[in-house]
Amino acid sequence: MPQLEFAWWIVNFSLIWASVLIVISLLLNSFPPNSAGQSSSSLTLNKTTTNWQWL
């Protein structure tokens, strides 16, 4: 029955692409865009220096 195989191919194709698009949209929405006027507090780096003492 080629019609049934083609129907399952269409179903699997649509399910795979729907899941791929959902995963991509979730990944893109999980990272909020940083606007130019807003500084992200999670990406701040505390720069410190160390004074080495030579023996």
UniProtKB/Swiss-Prot annotation:
Cellular component, GO, one term: proton-transporting ATP synthase complex
Transmembrane segments: 8-28
GO molecular function terms listed in the Swiss-Prot or TrEMBL record: proton transmembrane transporter activity
Main function: Mitochondrial membrane ATP synthase (F(1)F(0) ATP synthase or Complex V) produces ATP from ADP in the presence of a proton gradient across the membrane which is generated by electron transport complexes of the respiratory chain. F-type ATPases consist of two structural domains, F(1) - containing the extramembraneous catalytic core and F(0) - containing the membrane proton channel, linked together by a central stalk and a peripheral stalk. During catalysis, ATP synthesis in the catalytic domain of F(1) is coupled via a rotary mechanism of the central stalk subunits to proton translocation.
Subunit structure: F-type ATPases have 2 components, CF(1) - the catalytic core - and CF(0) - the membrane proton channel.
Membership in a protein family: Belongs to the ATPase protein 8 family.
Name this polypeptide is given: ATP synthase protein 8
Organism of provenance: Strongylocentrotus purpuratus
Taxonomy of the source species: Eukaryota, Metazoa, Echinodermata, Eleutherozoa, Echinozoa
Name of the gene: MT-ATP8
